[in-house]
Amino acid sequence: MSALAGLVDKGLMAPDWAQALAPVDEQIAAMGRFLREELAAGRTYQPTGEWVFRAFQRPLADVRVLIVGQDPYPNPEHPIGLSFAVRGDVWPLPPSLVNIYTELRDDLGLMPPRHGDLTAWADQGVMLLNRSLTVRPGASNSHRGKGWEPITACAIEALVRRGGPLVAILWGSDARNLRPMLGQIPVVESPHPSPLSAYRGFFGSRPFSRANRLLVEQGGRAVDWALPME
């Protein structure tokens, strides 16, 4: 059984994503070996198990907005396989997510919740994709360049081939470097929401209302960015 077929069989990846990622099936298998070797060497990784490919559990056909992150939070037990999101019981929230919530309030007047679980966005077709899908706890960027990038690039290329209605939200230089890959897909871009750069143009960039406007212009439905309070 191929790596992708195994993921679909376990309910960890939508079938249309498995079809789109067929060109990197061997690379996905190689990443599985890499992660097993990490564990054998006493080096854990996160997120684990069913959350590694969580961004691919909703169908490719349903994706309306792509938000690209760098890699999962390195804080132990924080990441849930969706970029910028954390487990619902994590407190305090990561500073980048606090700034995202501040911009959400300023942009759309929506009161942010106390939790950092962004599953409600994913359920509406917002793909929260990290360029690297795993990280060693406590070591940011530790799995960068280990082999995830060709896989996530293939995913982005699949979205571009599928076409709109689709909007890409690119925060920070790493994400913005992907713009040439996106072709004619409308893009909303700004500095990263990190405290190091949020005041250099993330605050006031209104990404949520701008993305909705671009979706509607393509004949799509606007995203309801409100998150459940609990």
UniProtKB/Swiss-Prot annotation:
Catalytic activity: Hydrolyzes single-stranded DNA or mismatched double-stranded DNA and polynucleotides, releasing free uracil
Gene expressing this chain: ung
Organism, scientific name: Nocardioides sp. (strain ATCC BAA-499 / JS614)
Entry-linked InterPro entries: UDG_fam1, Ura-DNA_Glyclase_AS, Uracil-DNA_glycosylase-like, Uracil-DNA_glycosylase-like_sf
Listed PANTHER family: URACIL-DNA GLYCOSYLASE (PTHR11264:SF0)
Name recorded for this polypeptide: Uracil-DNA glycosylase
Family: Belongs to the uracil-DNA glycosylase (UDG) superfamily. UNG family.
GO cellular component: cytoplasm
Known function: Excises uracil residues from the DNA which can arise as a result of misincorporation of dUMP residues by DNA polymerase or due to deamination of cytosine.
Localization of this protein: Cytoplasm
GO biological process assignments: base-excision repair, AP site formation via deaminated base removal
Source species taxonomy: Bacteria, Bacillati, Actinomycetota, Actinomycetes, Propionibacteriales
Catalytic residues, chain numbering: D71
Pfam families: UDG
Keyword Metal-binding found: no
Catalytic class of the enzyme: hydrolase
Keywords: Cytoplasm, DNA damage, DNA repair, Hydrolase
PROSITE patterns named among the record's database cross-references: U_DNA_GLYCOSYLASE
Main location: cytoplasm
The keyword Heme is annotated on this UniProt entry: no
